[in-house]
Amino acid sequence: LHPYGKTSEVQRRQMTTVQADNVLNIAVDGNFDDCQDLVKAMFADAPFRAEMNLSAVNSINFARIAAQIPYYVYAALNLGAPEREVAVSVPTGNFGNILAAWAAKQMGLPIVKFIVASNRNDILSRFLAENDMSVKQVEPSLSPSMDIGVSSNFERLLFEFLGRDALLTAKTMADFRSSGKMAVDAPVSCTHLRAHETV
């Protein structure tokens, strides 16, 4: 799925000209969040998922995030890790790629700072800078992959923020979905995340 009219022509062609029997791309009248909501709903429907033999290669599938972890290990080693600490700055909308960096840190990689770079769709930057995760209208930009109102993978980090309490995480996310806003007291172990808004 892709948001109709909200990708570049090159991106649209990459998605819509694949000639494979097991690939079907559909343009959705909406934004990237609408596409993600539809995909999540399909994956939540277990009988449908099994009947259609669905798979996803975006960051909804944790395998994609796991596959990105070696990028950070490779980069850090080339910068002198483990003897030298490193910082990473990652343009992000859906929080998947930087979540891979965070996972690498949990495995022992000496990352001392994470800089979350965003465009005008800055829900992550606002949350990290001001503890303000409130949903706003998505504004189209020159970086459509970052034009996201709600970062799908943030729930995975929230699980860590909330002491790996699955019930509290589920309740917090349900409250967020109904109210459109969230504030969380992050533990000290998560304070090395920083926001940076791109120009």
Describe each PLM feature range.
Residues 174-180:
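Long, charge-rich alpha-helical interaction segments
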